[in-house]
Regions:
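Transmembrane alpha-helix interface/packing and boundary motifs in multi-pass membrane proteins
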Residues: 28-44, 104-114
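Interfacial segments of multi-pass membrane proteins
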Residues: 44-61, 104-109, 123-132
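Short amphipathic alpha-helical coupling elements at transmembrane boundaries
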Residues: 52, 86-93, 138-149
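Hydrophobic alpha-helical transmembrane segments
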Residues: 20-24, 46, 66-71, 98-102, ...
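Helix-adjacent hinge/juxtasegments
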Residues: 64-108
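Juxtamembrane boundary at the C-terminal end of a transmembrane helix
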Residues: 164-175
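Alpha-helical transmembrane segments of multi-pass membrane proteins
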Residues: 26, 30, 52, 72-81, ...
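Juxtamembrane interface at the ends
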Residues: 84-90, 121-137
C-alpha cells in the first residue's frame, strides 16, 4: 500500500505496454503503407522504432535496436530504388521512362482516387515507351519489364519493413 499522492511502480505498470502497443500499431500501419503506397511505409516503421528508443531514454539494448533499424532503413531504401532501376534499364527501358512513370504515378495519385498511382504510372510508362519504340507490342513488353522492376522494389521494401518490425519485436522482448 502506498500513501495518497505518491506514485508506485504498480500504478505505472500499463504505461510502457500502452506505448509499445502504440509503436506496434504505427509500425503495422507502416508495413501496410509499403503494400498500399499511400503512406511512407518504411519511414513510418523506422520513425516508430526510433521513437521507442528515444522516448524511453535509450539504454544499450535499445540503442543497438535503433542502430539496426537505421541500417536496415538506409539499406532497404537504397536497394528499393537501385535494384529495380538496374533491372528496368537492363531490360531496355531508359531512366527517362522510369522518371515519367514516377511523375505519372504522382499525377494519378492526385487525379484518380485509390487506383491513380497505378493507372498514372503504368499509363505514363506505356506512353513513353510507345513514343520511344513506335510499336505497341514492344512498348507493352517494356512496360511489363518496368512493372516487374517496380514489384521487385516493393518486395525489397516489404521485406525490409518486416525485418525492422521483427528487430523491434526482439528488442521489446529483450528489454
Amino acid at each position: 500500500m502506498h500513501r495518497r499522492g505518491t506514485i508506485s511502480p504498480r500504478s505505472l505498470a500499463g504505461v510502457p505496454a500502452l506505448g509499445e502497443l502504440l509503436v506496434a500499431a504505427v509500425m503495422v500501419v507502416g508495413v501496410a503503407g509499403v503494400v498500399v503506397p499511400v503512406l511512407p511505409g518504411l519511414f513510418l516503421v523506422w520513425a516508430a522504432g526510433i521513437g521507442w528508443v528515444w522516448l524511453d531514454g535509450g539504454g544499450p539494448t535499445r540503442i543497438v535496436v535503433g542502430v539496426l533499424l537505421t541500417v536496415l532503413f538506409v539499406v532497404g531504401t537504397v536497394a528499393k530504388y537501385v535494384l529495380p532501376a538496374r533491372s528496368a534499364t537492363g531490360a531496355g527501358a531508359p531512366r527517362s521512362t522510369l522518371l515519367l512513370g514516377a511523375a505519372g504515378g504522382l499525377a494519378g495519385f492526385f487525379l484518380i482516387p485509390v487506383v491513380g498511382v497505378v493507372v498514372g504510372g503504368v499509363g505514363a510508362v506505356y506512353l513513353a515507351e510507345l513514343v520511344r519504340l513506335q510499336h505497341p507490342g514492344a512498348a507493352w513488353r517494356s512496360t511489363w519489364a518496368v512493372l516487374r522492376a517496380v514489384g521487385i522494389g516493393m518486395l525489397i521494401e516489404l521485406a525490409t519493413a518486416v525485418l525492422m518490425l521483427g528487430t523491434w519485436t526482439v528488442g521489446v522482448l529483450v528489454t
